[in-house]
């Protein structure tokens, strides 16, 4: 073969790859252009952090890369709340294989790393969908790039591209579905097993929806299978089981930790409910429909206006048999119904109702719709020109009806009008195509492709890739690093082994500790220990289904949580409770006067008599102080007046003040003190005690709400004598640390009076406790914290954490992998024997 022939061969190979390459590059280019237009860093000062990407993913990614670079254990993290199992958190949020490339990323550019991965996944969606079309329909038509772009820039991706823990599954879904087709039709299992196992390992939650879809789609394939149906069922069950089992190394630890979270429990709906009418739902396939991420269940199902046209032509196409059409159209209709029906919605979402971010399976609806539309495109010659007119009339009627019965706040008139314009444009182009020569048809295809990609681009620009200020997110990082380093230096001068927690007065997220690398008592995570949230709420602190926060804690409770330092973005008022110890720029570090070590003794009587479930937050804290020896109420009521829009406290004595309030509709309360101080209390609807700070006699404290409603305030003054007494009772017997690491703690304690050694560590299955070298079954204090009964005398204490279920899961995963390899070997040997037998004949 001469050089010319070699060059021609290479050229042909590149030509064959061009549609797939275009399916990747077109979404990539569009996403980059939109980022430039939206002034995303480095093209401006914006970034793509949205919703959970802002509050969870960036902090968790930062903690992940810190652990990888420092060599710390991947089993446990102390920077996430009071401490958290990291294997389950990794499985839930970070398990994408692509995330390991974060090792190449400088720490200060984690945001950009996540943004690049977001854009990469969008582009890979286009590639894998185009690859599916190429293999499924045995075509390399350039149109696969256009349809791949439609999948990549769908409304689901516009709404949820920021949700980087989900999008690997969107990339893999076309390959998994192609794999199940190969499994049934060609008896090939490798693609199905590898892609499904990878999806399950990457994100079990979205994989549940893929698995439900696979079962339904498999039934269609089985109906179309003429012979070997039993074998197909066996293969599908066997390799699905192996794929699921391969994910056990992460699934089992994740399931155990989720069992202790706010996501535990299944409550199937008792009655059928329809969320909305189907016309309003399907109207969300129009262009410029605002993506929806709230709690009203609206799915994001736009995939291009052209699909509204092609799906009708699919129904009238004479080149596609009704035996093929009927089950696929029924599946599409079933999926559309699933968005509107509460029971089906519950099943699709893994036997849970989503807490916002609805219709999480809608990418599968978009997948199926685009596949049917592509098949229509391939068989356009089997349609007639008048079918276009019928489709035009039906689409017009649909638009009118959907507009009539849709919520104008969700789908505006501009959306319907623009959709109508595009429908007319596509109708005209199709009519020209039907009446044109082969050359004219080529031009029509080119023009239509440009129109489709333009439509998708404009919609994605208008509804996707929202931004926030990068500057405001990162501006304090260096100052935080400086003051935290000074805190470490101060502690290391006093002791070789130390433990303390730090909190912020003005936090960006409830996971700021993971962002800046310090230990805290606040977190926001779906894997959060729900018992900690419950005790926080019982004490008048901030807590919910997937978060708990130090807001509302008195100095006594803060001390029990080992909260030693407070970071403030502005200088705080003078107070006997804390001292300024460091500053950097506009960031200030204060040391609390009251802070206990990680472990401290509590009398049996206190643990037994403290009834923290039946009172309010203030009374429960007062009761604890009383049980610890306080002779007076720690938080005593002082006069306050409440009227519409404002509550007022006239300060008659120097002291530290708090306030509790009735229910409020405003999400923010503002404190104004007559000395000029101001403070904002966000998430006021969570109902926590307000820390009003130190005030002097004669000061006036006003608490205002933006909704101009009457909020009944009960004000309290902190009794320092009661606080001192309660604190000294706990501080009189504490554990001295001798070593501390991510998953192992050792210490000694000299117990003067038998009782319970309580740790400010959430009680979870992974902890093993040793007292004087003997394993001891840990108990629970306040239903949330690790507690160990101790007799009087000196004791050596050791706590070791091992992720529960990790070893069992690893063994199951390894076993399933071996079984797959053995199955593949056996299958290969069978095929070889068949070939040999045929050659002998």
How would you label these PLM feature ranges?
Residues 8-12, 631-841:
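Active-site-proximal, structured, solvent-exposed surfaces of multi-pass membrane proteins
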Residues 451-474, 488-560, 594-596, 601-626, ...:
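Extracytoplasmic/lumenal acceptor-recognition loop(s) of multi-pass membrane glycoenzymes
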Residues 125-133, 172-184, 212-220, 308-315, ...:
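Transmembrane alpha-helical segments
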